[in-house]
């Protein structure tokens, strides 16, 4: 008779069941998903913080650099509201006219003399090309005569040179300069430099001069035939230059006085003349040189101005701050209580402060609404020479 035996049951099971494996995979997936979510959240937070920092950095740079030009606008080392005359042979170049050292332009108003630069990119002219001004955005023109403590030691009428008080003046052939005293200012291009002497002749630089600063008379109250800077009221008789050596001979109570005032008390300033280099700039919103990550071309805040290139004046453009979309400018007239748009200003010589409002965006799309971060920032700058 045949017998059968049942297989023995193992005391412990070996390996994993299918259910246990699926549970393990699910737990691992949950942990991995959580880690990825935390990483993604931190990454987005980092990108948002980085883009916000970039916006703040661009705003700081824009306001800092622009404020320097605004504060100095209209300044000269002599007297406020001086009549000035330019002898530049500039053919109407905007940087050769010092009559309106602060000038605003509305969104549809073109800046005179703005054109493409030598490389084919824009220099403030309205258009869609790189560096060209975005249509509908405002712009501003600023000029100042920056002093280096240079005074006139001698200026002989009938000559084309001015002797300075030092040979360490850092002026170069081609620089646009101003010579001024308490009555008159003259704008010219330096045609020659020899130690402590600078020339203002018709040659030696481009665009050059049409005459000499000895014949300035426009804007004065007596229209002298010749004008000698450094002499009282511009008057010189031979070697006699009143006010140059006698420090008691001072200017009158007003810049327009025809006669200097003798003051033995020393309470007034001696009649002296100064020389300063002129800096000019234009600020506007233009099409950026670089493209963003999504391939679009943004906008930037630009500064364009004349530079001395080996004796020839050329315009140079600088991209000051990227991702500046809009710029709104408002101007405060002397004695006024409200800021005015450029179209509401009747006399640019009366402007004492400028309010600048910039609209900036982030380089990347990091907003919760699927758009770029946007910030609007405002800054008010006072013109130093007109606030006193």
Functional labels for PLM-detected ranges:
Residues 2-4, 12-67, 71-73, 387-388:
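Aliphatic-rich helix starts adjacent to a transmembrane/signal segment
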Residues 4, 13, 50, 54, ...:
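Short linear sequence signals and composition-biased patches located at protein termini or domain-edge surfaces
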Residues 71, 75, 179-182:
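Hydrophobic/aromatic-lined pockets within catalytic cores
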Residues 141, 178, 187-189, 199, ...:
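Structured core elements
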Residues 142-145, 149-157:
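Helix-loop junctions and short alpha-helical segments
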Residues 158-167, 341:
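Short alpha-helix capping/helix-loop boundary micro-motifs
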Residues 162-163, 195-207, 211-213:
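A generic structural motif
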Residues 166-196:
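Ser/Thr/Gly-rich low-complexity blocks that favor extended beta-strand/coil architectures
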